[in-house]
Amino acid sequence: MNNNIQITSTAIRILVFLAFLLLTSFAFAQTPSLDLVITHGHIIDGTGSPWYSGDLGIRDGKIAAIGNLSAAPRKRTIDAAGKVVAPGFIDMLGQSELTILVDPRLPSKIFQGITSEITGEGGSIAPLNDAIIQSDRQGYEHFKITPDWRTFRQYFARLEKQGMGINLASYVGATQVRRMVLGDDDKQPTLAQLEQMQALVREAMKDGTVGVSTSLEYAPAPYAKTEELIALATEASKSGGIYSTHMRDESASVLEAIDEALRIGREAHIPVEIWHIKVAGKDNWGRMPEVVAKINAARAAGADVSADTYAYTAWYNGFSAFIPPWAHDGGDAKLVERLKDPVTRARIRKDMLAPSKEWDNEWQEIPGPDAIMIGAVENPALAPLLGKRLSEIAKSSNKDPMDALFDILIQDPSTEVAVFGMSQPDVTLALQQPWVAIDNDSEGTSPEGILGQSHPHPRAYGTFPRILAKYVREEKVLTLEDAIRKFSALPAQRMRLTDRGVLKAGMWADVVIFDPATVHDRATFDNPNQLSEGMEYVLINGVPVIDQGKMTGALPGKVLRGAGYVP
């Protein structure tokens, strides 16, 4: 009898074991296969925490799991041994709203590891009317683009139909809504006109923009009083937006410009982002500690203010920014008329030669004409000037440098230039602040085709890898974890991108894999059209756009709509 009991007990144990195997196999079979597992990586999650070893699994465009995934079924494996696995980089200020229609892959962006861009600096891609399209016709024709949208809803629909190589969000520009109502004239809006402008901001926020922006150095933006900007920012605030600004002055009156930005934030009840924070002009070098102290004091008092930087010592803007604001009244055509008129030209020269706190006089900020390099032109006749210094152009044409500047603008008021006017210690100090993220402040471009014909600031190709190479690896002014936080979690939190910017389960799988010992920028001021190296894999929404260091051509990007979006 005891033998029978023993046999029965053994049989039961065997049956239980077999049942366990069967159930385990069934459960394993029911577990969805992962699309991709990244193994053995040094995971830097974006929060600033130290790296750790682990695997990362992706399914249906999102991060499905992080940990030991050695037993997980998958369609593909990427071995990231010795490499960093990090969140995709977020560009806090890009300019790709037009170039993404020319080459939606945006090679210059993705080879830096950029997976998301926030665009729309003051003069945004929408709203549009016939007068603006006619005024900006040369730019559209340069890129062979037909503007078949009038609103952000229509523009975003065009992007989604075409396909996008990165994720893209946009501000509605305060300059743009001003142009819609007032044109390019130096005048103040009536109450009815201001209400029209506010209505345009409301519509843009419903269309999915993330906030309202200003570029207060570039006409017609300087004509706007602070009260006008508060009114527009208030509308964006109602929809959960942010106010971002290229401030009215970044040189002698930089502290007063910060005060204006803080006032707008305070009275409109809206967060403030100061774009490409800097102290420009040799006479102002060494003043970044004052800027940092002012912002730290504001933050300590409760102001929701932060900033970003591209960490180069040269800026890049329209050549026409050297001209006093009054001369821009009426737009580019009127500016050209004034530059052709000897009397008005002499007045412009006089204003540029006189230091002033009434406007950001860039001519007073440069050490000389050798500090200006021609970067982009829309008039093909000026193409031979690309990459040349103003001093060289003036000498070869037997002109005074200021006359050479005026004559270039007469031929092409859209000319853009690189200006060497910042100090390295100021740039480094700004970069080190915990509330400073990173911006590219450039359009996405390519070394090939029509986009490769310009001579951009090297930041267009190199900002993020340059920070990893110069400021992390070589100079050690940032830790790798700090840099990745500035590239990802910090901007995601600032822009309220709640499902991006950090590596954790449930987030969209925007992921970069690179070797921290070798990643670097290649673009220089003399030869800027060079892709950065070192990004071995870049995934956007789980889809590789760079695979083993090569561009795939995939267009998995999404429009990133703001909190006020109404479908």
Locate the predicted segments by residue:
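Acidic, glycine-enriched loop/beta-strand segments at the rims
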Residues: 35, 43-55, 416-427, 475-484, ...
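Metal-associated gating/positioning segment near the N- to mid-region
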Residues: 72, 77-150
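Bacterial N-terminal signal peptides that target proteins for export
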Residues: 2-16
